[in-house]
Amino acid sequence: MDFVFLIKNNLFDKGKISLGKFDSDEEYEELSKMTPIEIDRTLDINWAANIELPDYESTFISLVTETLIDTSILFMSEKIWKPIVAGHPFIVLGNVNTISYLKEQGYKTFDRWIDESYDLEPDHHKKLIWL
């Protein structure tokens, strides 16, 4: 997710944001100057395999930002599987037809509550604005 987009659109403080390690201490310092920030877990551990249920229990929906967004392939990382395992509603900023593929594989999504037409948008930036 583009943190600058979140900050410019006043979305940074609207929920919980998870991210990996910063590339440098300077990046962390810059981010901490821009907004109140709370780090509730160490960034020295790879949390890819962990599912933190309290995070899902304290939020209404997950915005999943996939690692690789490419129009030529369908890529799904652990990021999409975490809310699925937790039974948590989600929107995915990923490749075209990610939701469609999940449905084809038998997964149920939250289409009764979420307009999933964004899944058909091939332009990453248009999809980000829609979301």
What are these regions (language model features)?
Residues 1-64, 70-77, 81-131:
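Pol beta-like nucleotidyltransferase catalytic core
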